[in-house]
Amino acid sequence: MVSPPGVLSSLLLLAAMAGGSSQQCSEGRTYSDAIISPNPETIRIMRVSQTFSVGDCTAACCDLLTCDLAWWFEGSCYLVKCMRSENCEPRTTGPIRSYLTFVRRPVQRPGQLLDYGDMMLSRGSPSGAWGDSLEDLRKDLPFLGKDGGPEETTEYSDEYKDLERGLLQPSNQQDPRGSAEYPDWSLLPSNEGGFNATATGDNSAASMEKLQDPTPHPLDQEQLQALNESTWSPTPGHSSISSVWPSSASPLPTEEGLEGEETLQLQEQPSNSSGKEVPMPSHNPSPASLESSPATTEKNSNFTVTPRSRKHSTPTFPTSTVLTGLTPPPWPLSPTASRTVKALAVSAGDNLVLTLPDREAELKASVEPAPPADTTYSYEWSLMSHPVDFQGKIKQENKPTLHLSQLSVGLYAFRVAVSSENAFGEGYVNVTVMPAARVNQPPVAVVSPQTQELSVPLTSALIDGSQSTDDTEIVSYHWEEVDGPFLGEEFPADTPILRLSNLVPGNYTFRLTITDSDGATNSTTASLVIRDAVDYPPVANAGPNQTITLPQNTIILNGNQSSDDHQIVLYEWFAGPGGESKEMVMQGAQTPYLHLSELQEGEYTFQLMVTDSSGQQSTALVAVTVQAENNQAPVAVAGPDKELVFPVQSATLDGSRSSDDHGIVCYHWEHIRGPSAVEMENVDKAIATVTGLQVGIYHFRLTVRDQQGLSSTSTLTVAVKKENNSPPRAQAGGRHVLILPNNSITLDGSRSTDDRGIVSYLWIRDGQSPAAGDVIGGSDHRAALQLTNLVEGVYTFHLLVTDSQGASDSDAATVEVLPDPKKDGLVELILQVGVEQLTEQQKETLVRQLAVLLNVLDSDVKVLKIQAHTDVSTVIVFYVQSGSPFKVLRAAAVARNLHKRLSKEKEAFLLFKVLRVDTAGCLLKCSGHGHCDPITKRCICSQLWMENLIQRYMWDGESNCEWSVFYVAALALTLTLLTGAVSWLCICCCRRRKRTKIRKKTKYTILDSMDEQERMELRPKYGIKHRSTEHNSSLMVSESEFESDQDTLFSRERMERGVLKGSLNGCARNGVSFGYYSKDR
């Protein structure tokens, strides 16, 4: 949270003017390896960031008028304000980097500035710290105990000397802890004292009442002189302020100070921080900072100060309040030319507090002393802070009186600057606009129902009071029993709904009292009547009177309509008066149903007596009338007259609509009149056929007879005419487009026309159309053809219409069935449950479980079809959509994800056991070298192609046809040859190694001299040169223990040698030396 901008501007001005008075501040006693007892009730501590040395910390304490002690602890700077001298007594501690430096100030401080600065910085947390709570201090100062004092420390002895100057040398190291844990020492004070309260939200009124921004007193001559020594240096695009800050008593220049002006960076205080922020001093200002031109100074809503280090970013002000830049004095300031300015006591009046709907205010500035006769004061009003939504009007900004209108809720800070040629003064005032006060409306208690009547065994009831209303909030409900039987101590009294149980008969009255958040109450009552159980006698009902006609002599009387408030335990049927002597058979006389048979003509009366569980009885009578058999003559109906057009092959005579009360047993057709004789078939049946009709009028008579011999006749006229007939015109309906999964359609041929009417329709499927698809209810012989279960493809149906004269016409209708656009996203889930056992509620539960597994919404899982897979399994076809607009996810990815999630979950995660999860259609591309089997969902590869076994069994497991049989065979042959070659090479190497082993020394003897051409050289088997000398003989024999020929090798030397090599005994003229030559290998 951030303080109001008005307080920020006042604090900036205070810091600028404090620079003049702090020039007399000097460094006092210093202590090393020492701490103080930071009791929050006696001292106040503020942590300062962006300090690089003990000297910086001491200078910061000098710059703050309320600071008494600069504490440098472990690379961090803390400013301490001591209420009393004994509160800041140094104490010794262990070998840690802790230095205490007391500052010396003049006895006479500027009273106005001191009071104002103390008040500005003392409005902190109740703990007494300027910005750091006790918990935050414990993070920085680990030696603090729970009471806030040091642990195991002793008082500092007088033998401690002043701190060496080397400790005051600047350090370029920055506090490694940063601003994440500690609030930075910046220009913005905390909100806990009321400086950061905003005028928005529900709590604005409470926060505004705490905020009282005082107006500073008139400046004395010394303070104005210090103000004249300050400089105003504009920054491009912003209004910035640079002040000459005094250093400590013995300032040590830092590297940053030598390079240029050191200024402070404005940093925004985090909202959860309770610390205040104080401006960081700048030392050794450069001459450039002392130059300013008022002509280049402009107003801006943002205050920017050059950062001390480029490593820190420049934060921004909060958006809840808008700051207006400070306006520099109207006269030019120069560090080399000082002038005397008279201080004016300017008052902008008391702080104003307005409450909506009051949106106007008037601010008036008063100045002391009054202007001389020849001089007038210039007034300049500036709005330093206002709410973000401020759109009001400000009038007469350059006059003593400022008119404000159309103010919105929030805090406004105004500054008025009064100046003349040699005088200057300024004042501040706050205007707070509070929201309109709310008028509380009392709550309205509502109970439902207000009246209830129950009868035993119902002994429980509910009374709902949750429908009660209030303009804010109902905080409590209280039920109490006003009248009725006592309910005991377990009576639920503080719930919106009153639940009652185990009630006894009686009249109850309950009162509900509700209370809202403002303490207003309202009550209402509800009544409840519990009645005792009443046992009413049963009501017997034997049913209505019955009448039957012989030969029917059986009937069933039904008494199950009898009723009782509890239960009927006994049914009894009796023959009524006048029926005891008649013969009949009664069955089920003690059941609700009485079966009567062998009844005779006459009237019967039967009595039903019912008995309930308490023994109460009731009776009812029913009459059964048996009438004598009454035969009526049949009625012959030959049908309507017919008019036929010649030529006609045959005509149908229909007498099936003839009727009789007992049934017709005989039909007879006869030709009674006509132009020529005709041939008739089935003349003794209800429907007869006539052929051989010629042009003329024919009369046929139908005679029917019943079982009693009664008969009846009817005549039919058939007129055969010769006239022209126009053929019908068939219209099948044209072309239709159907998109799966919608696989049903109706083709309408009723628009076919004929001059005398169409008598028959016939739909014929074209031979090139798909065979799949069913005709519903024989509609292929009707005007409208109904089709279902169509598959992807183009269907052609021919409509053949025929009129009464046999003329016909045909037309074709085309149905193009397009594939389902969601086909690639359909997933097939087979569950171990019969399709007849799967209910709608279980289906919705399955959808929710699938949505949880797939991490989607329930509405994203769409079930298209549920059908039987086997007698004990059901297949569910669904797809999953996501995104906006909706996009159907790929079935392969959904099936793979669902299979993976099911393998990780418990076995009983779904309602039923999952038998298989796969795509509904076969979507495999098979690498373009095969096709996908729709049953097994596996690729069937073409000839000379096979499956990539590595991808199938080691990677994603998707069936494919990526490998060529030739390539695989060539690779296998290559690997086989390579394996054989490597094996052969290894065997050869092993044998060679075995042959090179040194054998036992072999002895040789010289053979007899032989012909020079048969000279041979005897050599060891493995080429090892013998140590024996050369001999002249050409042949040598071994005398070793092994006489085998396998131990010696003979090689024939070439007859001629260029140069004979010498041996130990010299050269032999007729022989060569015995040795090893690599070429003999």
Curated annotation (Swiss-Prot):
Motif Endocytosis signal per UniProt: ranges: 1004-1007
Q: From which residue to which does the signal peptide run?
A: 1-22
State what protein this is by name: Dyslexia-associated protein KIAA0319 homolog
The alphabetical list of record keywords is: Cell membrane, Developmental protein, Endosome, Glycoprotein, Membrane, Neurogenesis, Phosphoprotein, Repeat, Signal, Transmembrane, Transmembrane helix
Which residues does the entry place in the Cytoplasmic compartment? 986-1081
Transmembrane intervals: 965-985
Q: Does the keyword GTP-binding apply?
A: no
- List locations, semicolon-separated: Cell membrane; Early endosome membrane
- Identify its membrane topology class: Single-pass type I membrane protein
Provide a GO biological process annotation: positive regulation of SMAD protein signal transduction
Corresponding gene? Answer: Kiaa0319
What glycosylation sites does the entry record? 196, 228, 272, 302, 430, 507, 522, 545, 560, 742
Stretches for region Disordered: 168-331
- What's the PTM story here? N-glycosylated. O-glycosylated.
Cellular component GO terms held in the UniProt record: early endosome; early endosome membrane; plasma membrane
Give me the stretches of Polar residues compositional bias: 197-206, 222-234, 283-307, 314-324
Q: What is its main location?
A: membrane
Give the record's subunit note: Homodimer. Interacts with AP2M1; required for clathrin-mediated endocytosis.
Residues modified as Phosphoserine: 1009
Q: Which SMART domains match?
A: MANEC, PKD
- PKD domain: which residues? 345-436, 444-533, 539-629, 630-723, 729-820
- Residue spans of biased composition, Low complexity class: 236-255
The chain positions of domain MANSC read 23-99
